[in-house]
């Protein structure tokens, strides 16, 4: 999720979209196994949604970057263009996290899930989760 939210072109290493694991100690060919027919899975679906959000968001493609909240396990940053603001929120912890910050608006839509998000009372991030909140203007 971080790669798709940050400025620049996201890079997904060959096989990562399928959740393939490899050991680098076995050499470079082990990192690029052949796929006869990869199986679409939960990770593939998530990466597909991230790519779709990036593709369709002016802010994620061309917007400025501003750090909003940073801990050892969570980060929230804003990408803003002339027409759009998106808050990228990531929780890399096994516990839920409630973030308190000034969003500058009351509601947003998560570009990953399509669900509305209410900033009132804090923003809860489930364990090991990400959200791309497109802010209402």
Segments from the language model and where they lie:
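Active-site region of glycoside hydrolase catalytic domains
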Residues: 1
């Amino acid at each position: 999720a971080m790669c798709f939210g940050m400025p620049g072109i996201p890079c997904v290493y060959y096989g990562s979209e399928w959740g393939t694991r490899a050991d680098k100690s076995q050499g470079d060919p082990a990192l690029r196994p052949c796929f006869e027919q990869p199986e679409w899975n939960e990770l593939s679906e998530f990466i597909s949604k991230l790519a779709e959000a990036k593709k369709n968001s002016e802010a994620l493609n061309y917007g400025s970057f501003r750090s909003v909240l940073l801990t050892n396990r969570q980060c929230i940053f804003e990408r803003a263009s002339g027409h759009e603001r998106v808050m990228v929120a990531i929780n890399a912890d096994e516990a839920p996290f409630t973030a308190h910050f000034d969003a500058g608006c009351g509601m947003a839509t998560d570009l990953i899930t399509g669900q509305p998000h209410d900033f009132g009372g804090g923003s809860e991030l489930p364990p090991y989760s990400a959200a791309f909140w497109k802010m209402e203007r």
